[in-house]
């Protein structure tokens, strides 16, 4: 009997139902999973606030500081799809618990770091164990909440908590750095992990879908090594320049490895990323939208953090609070975009508009200077950026799994979140490279390098990064307008919603 298909080749089907849990137990399980997921999400931003303090304590260079952020994001992104397969093969509960323990151990290692290398290794290990934990959590939600309405409510709660993780990370990072030490931005994960582990051990049942699940070892090696080579190539350009053979060697090698990965996925019996997930036009447009947004957005957090702390003299806590208006604007726009605008106007009208608004906000932010104030040169600009991103990210992430059968919801969610993390990794490395080059060029043209000249060179590096973020968002405007279909998208009844991991 032929198999039913939806959304350009996506197979229809339902998730294998796990034994039904008691209603009250299900919601306690949701609480445990949400706590664990919050730990993973907030770590993408919590260390940003503490970076200046960590840099001063450990003595690493400006050229190396992006690796504290990139190491986590790259490991998480490159291993996320593999983490989902491991959960299917060995069981969701073991994967979830091992992910929690490993994440906590890596956090403790980072908190005790006595140098740059030890801290980067710890951050990479956090990302690796986070890549095991996040897909397991998603699968546990899908199997625990088998009723469609309950599952929708569960994903709504889970997505809201996960979406707030970035803001929690910024604020919590500031409070911990001010009250204790930058190391507590890592140690705090141990406390959270204990709560999640005990709850998971007591409440979660053991389920596994290993009948036909196998590890795609060649695919894993190709995609992980390809992503590493690309990001390392961008980072190497900052210290050795764009004319360095090493820079282009890594970039070309990374491109070839990723091309080989794409080829292998069309031939592998159990691909890490099934081709059917990529066949829908709106889904492909959403993946690109998330990639470009991640590349530009992570730059905003990193460079604006440095501007607020080093130029405006904000404390880490005050810096975290300074980002809250942007987060608030993003949340309001997200609610408006996903529940009102996209259902009525369609993504072709809404998502390019969001990109255009974010582009305008980033261009406006380039007006910062040595004598600027937060209320005039930062606050209105980040609110505009938040509105724009709110009209792009949540609708794009929702559309990325539109029409996907329930059996493919996990890999689709993993893919869209991998796109965000890959974009963040590449964007952080690329913007650091461009910012450093701008500062060097400014100093070369203004001699002698007085304190005033050096301060202005720093501003030039920030504004250059903001301009290139605007370029990325501008590219998103054009790409989204060209690729998204006209009309209102239709959601398959069996498709599970996407969540931000």
Walk through the language-model features, giving the residues of each:
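Interfacial helix-loop-helix linkers and transmembrane-helix boundary segments
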Residues: 87, 92-94, 150-152, 209-215, ...
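Intrinsic disorder in cytosolic terminal tails and internal cytosolic loops
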Residues: 1-25, 209, 451-455, 483-501
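C-terminal membrane-cytosol helix-exit motif in multi-pass small-molecule transporters
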Residues: 138, 190-209, 224-236, 253-268, ...
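12-transmembrane solute porter fold
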Residues: 26-49, 62, 68, 218, ...
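Cytoplasmic-side transmembrane-helix entry/capping segments in multi-pass membrane proteins
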Residues: 98, 150-162, 212-222, 247, ...
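Membrane-interface helix caps and helix-loop-helix hairpins in membrane proteins
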Residues: 116, 181-183, 206-213, 237-243, ...
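Transmembrane-helix bundle of Major Facilitator Superfamily
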Residues: 2-202, 336, 345, 363-366, ...
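Transmembrane alpha-helix termini and helix-breaking/packing motifs in multi-pass membrane transporters
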Residues: 171-180, 426-452
């Amino acid at each position: 009997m032929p198999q039913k298909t939806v959304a350009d080749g996506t197979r229809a089907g339902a998730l294998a139902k796990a034994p039904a849990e008691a209603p009250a137990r299900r919601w306690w399980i949701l609480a445990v999973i949400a706590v664990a997921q919050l730990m993973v999400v907030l770590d993408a931003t919590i260390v940003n606030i503490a970076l200046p303090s960590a840099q001063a304590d450990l003595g690493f260079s400006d050229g190396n500081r992006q690796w504290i952020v990139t190491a986590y994001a790259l490991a998480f992104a490159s291993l996320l799809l593999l983490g989902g397969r491991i959960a299917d093969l060995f069981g969701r509960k073991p994967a979830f618990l091992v992910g929690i323990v490993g994440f906590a151990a890596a956090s403790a290692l980072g908190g005790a770091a006595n140098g740059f290398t030890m801290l980067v290794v710890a951050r990479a290990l956090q990302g690796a164990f986070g890549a095991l934990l996040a897909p397991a959590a998603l699968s546990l939600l899908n199997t625990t909440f088998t009723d469609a309405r309950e599952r929708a409510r569960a994903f709504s709660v889970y997505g809201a908590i996960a979406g707030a993780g970035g803001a929690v990370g910024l604020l919590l990072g500031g409070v911990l750095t001010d009250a204790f030490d930058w190391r507590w931005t890592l140690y705090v994960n141990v406390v959270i992990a204990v709560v999640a582990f005990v709850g998971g051990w007591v409440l979660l049942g053991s389920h596994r879908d290993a009948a036909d699940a196998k590890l795609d070892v060649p695919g894993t090696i190709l995609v992980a090594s390809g992503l590493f080579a690309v990001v390392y190539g961008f980072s190497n350009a900052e210290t050795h320049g764009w004319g360095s053979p090493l820079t282009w060697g890594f970039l070309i090698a990374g491109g070839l490895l990723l091309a080989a990965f794409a080829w292998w996925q069309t031939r592998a019996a159990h691909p890490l990323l099934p081709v059917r997930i990529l066949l829908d036009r709106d889904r492909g447009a959403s993946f690109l939208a998330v990639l470009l947004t991640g590349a530009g957005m992570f730059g905003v957090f990193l460079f604006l953090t440095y501007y607020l702390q080093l130029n405006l003299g904000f404390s880490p806590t005050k810096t975290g609070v300074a980002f809250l208006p942007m987060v608030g604007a993003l949340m309001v726009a997200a609610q408006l975009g996903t529940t009102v605008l996209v259902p009525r106007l369609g993504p072709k009208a809404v998502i390019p508009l969001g990109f255009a608004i974010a582009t305008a906000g980033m261009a406006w932010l380039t007006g910062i200077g040595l004598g600027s104030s937060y209320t005039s040169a930062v606050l209105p600009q980040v609110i505009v950026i938040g509105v724009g991103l709110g009209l792009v990210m949540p609708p794009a992430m929702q559309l990325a799994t539109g029409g996907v059968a329930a059996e493919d919801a996990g890999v689709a969610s993993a893919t869209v979140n991998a796109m965000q993390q890959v974009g963040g990794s590449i964007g952080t490395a690329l913007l650091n490279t461009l910012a450093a080059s701008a500062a060097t060029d400014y100093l070369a043209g203004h001699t002698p390098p007085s304190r005033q000249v050096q301060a202005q060179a720093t501003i030039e590096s920030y504004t250059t990064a903001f301009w290139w973020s605007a370029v990325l968002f501008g590219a998103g405007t054009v790409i989204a307008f060209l690729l998204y279909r006209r009309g209102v998208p239709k959601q398959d009844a069996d498709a599970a919603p996407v969540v931000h991991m």
